Amino acid sequence: MDLLSMVLIGVGLAMDAFSISVSRGLALHESETNYALISALSFGTFQAAMPVLGWVSGLEIQRLVSALAPWAAFILLLIIGLKMIYESLIMEEEEFIFSYRELLVLSIATSIDAFAVGVSFALLDISIWLPVIVIGLITFILSLAGSYIGERVGHIFENRLEALGGLILILIGLKILLENVSFT
């Protein structure tokens, strides 16, 4: 596989993590820039690890995962998105609270499609290591940039944009569901 193809796959896989980083960045303050780095590391690590797991797992697990993964991603993103909307509309303005558990859930939900990419690499007999490095680095960079973009925009519009961030998560979950589930 050529480098351009790897980069395009990496960018495609990183877009959900980028969008989530922007939405979570909306609630950040300058003193919380460590969150941007930690979340970028988490998203990058999971985007890199999932293709390896998919590559190792091969076809048998793909049948099960391909049926359940879109639903799991949708439900996780829906719950977190609704929580963000609720907190922005109902609760008084609060400081952003960093949650490793929430970050883990978001990292897993956004990297499920990377698992399928890994299975595809195995079926096509493509070496996994260089694509994984490219995918992980691109996701890290775009997630870090997304957090900073969200933080900058959030200061302009205040914390009410967290509702928009929640809506973005729900729409990402819906997109994952619609792209991967046949309703016929």
From Swiss-Prot:
<keyword id="KW-1133">Transmembrane helix</keyword>
<dbReference type="InterPro" id="IPR003810">
    <property type="entry name" value="Mntp/YtaF"/>
</dbReference>
<feature type="transmembrane region" description="Helical">
    <location>
        <begin position="3"/>
        <end position="23"/>
    </location>
</feature>
<feature type="transmembrane region" description="Helical">
    <location>
        <begin position="65"/>
        <end position="85"/>
    </location>
</feature>
<keyword id="KW-1003">Cell membrane</keyword>
<keyword id="KW-0406">Ion transport</keyword>
<comment type="function">
    <text>Probably functions as a manganese efflux pump.</text>
</comment>
<dbReference type="InterPro" id="IPR022929">
    <property type="entry name" value="Put_MntP"/>
</dbReference>
<keyword id="KW-0813">Transport</keyword>
<dbReference type="GO" id="GO:0005886">
    <property type="term" value="C:plasma membrane"/>
</dbReference>
<keyword id="KW-0812">Transmembrane</keyword>
<feature type="transmembrane region" description="Helical">
    <location>
        <begin position="103"/>
        <end position="123"/>
    </location>
</feature>
<protein>
    <recommendedName>
        <fullName>Putative manganese efflux pump MntP</fullName>
    </recommendedName>
</protein>
<feature type="transmembrane region" description="Helical">
    <location>
        <begin position="163"/>
        <end position="183"/>
    </location>
</feature>
<dbReference type="Pfam" id="PF02659">
    <property type="entry name" value="Mntp"/>
</dbReference>
<dbReference type="GO" id="GO:0005384">
    <property type="term" value="F:manganese ion transmembrane transporter activity"/>
</dbReference>
<keyword id="KW-0464">Manganese</keyword>
<keyword id="KW-0472">Membrane</keyword>
<comment type="similarity">
    <text>Belongs to the MntP (TC 9.B.29) family.</text>
</comment>
<feature type="transmembrane region" description="Helical">
    <location>
        <begin position="36"/>
        <end position="56"/>
    </location>
</feature>
<feature type="transmembrane region" description="Helical">
    <location>
        <begin position="126"/>
        <end position="146"/>
    </location>
</feature>
